[in-house]
Amino acid sequence: MAHENVWFSHPRRYGKGSRQCRVCSSHTGLIRKYGLNICRQCFREKANDIGFNKFR
C-alpha cells in the first residue's frame, strides 16, 4: 500500500474536511450561508459578481 493510496483515503462525509470552496478548493473560512460554499477570500473577490452589495 503506497503513500498515494493511503493519503486522503479516510472517508470525509461530515465536518470541515468534507466541504471545500467551489472556486479554490480551500477548506478554511467557508461561507455556507445561502448555499454559497465559497471561502471568505474568494467571496471578497466575487461578491459584486454574485450580487452582494456593501451598504456603508
From Swiss-Prot:
Sites of Phosphoserine modification: 25
Xref: Pfam families: Ribosomal_S14 (PF00253)
Record's GO cellular component terms: cytosol; cytosolic small ribosomal subunit
Cross-referenced InterPro entries: Ribosomal_uS14, Ribosomal_uS14_CS, RIbosomal_uS14_euk_arc, Ribosomal_uS14_sf
Sample GO molecular function, one term: structural constituent of ribosome
Compartment list: Cytoplasm
Binding site for Zn(2+): 21, 24, 39, 42
Cofactor dependency: Zn(2+)
Co-factor binding details: Binds 1 zinc ion per subunit.
Cystine pairings recorded for this chain: none
Gene3D superfamilies on file: 30s Ribosomal Protein S14, Chain N
Keyword Metal-binding found: yes
Presence of the UniProt keyword Endoplasmic reticulum in the record: no
GO terms classed as biological process: cytoplasmic translation
Keywords annotated in UniProt: Cytoplasm, Metal-binding, Phosphoprotein, Ribonucleoprotein, Ribosomal protein, Zinc
Record function comment: Component of the ribosome, a large ribonucleoprotein complex responsible for the synthesis of proteins in the cell. The small ribosomal subunit (SSU) binds messenger RNAs (mRNAs) and translates the encoded message by selecting cognate aminoacyl-transfer RNA (tRNA) molecules. The large subunit (LSU) contains the ribosomal catalytic site termed the peptidyl transferase center (PTC), which catalyzes the formation of peptide bonds, thereby polymerizing the amino acids delivered by tRNAs into a polypeptide chain.
Subunit (UniProt): Component of the small ribosomal subunit (SSU). Mature yeast ribosomes consist of a small (40S) and a large (60S) subunit. The 40S small subunit contains 1 molecule of ribosomal RNA (18S rRNA) and 33 different proteins (encoded by 57 genes). The large 60S subunit contains 3 rRNA molecules (25S, 5.8S and 5S rRNA) and 46 different proteins (encoded by 81 genes).
Note: Present with 6490 molecules/cell in log phase SD medium.
Record-stated family: Belongs to the universal ribosomal protein uS14 family.
NCBIfam families xref list: PRK05766.1 (NF004424)
Name under which the protein is recorded: Small ribosomal subunit protein uS14A
Source species: Saccharomyces cerevisiae (strain ATCC 204508 / S288c) (Baker's yeast)
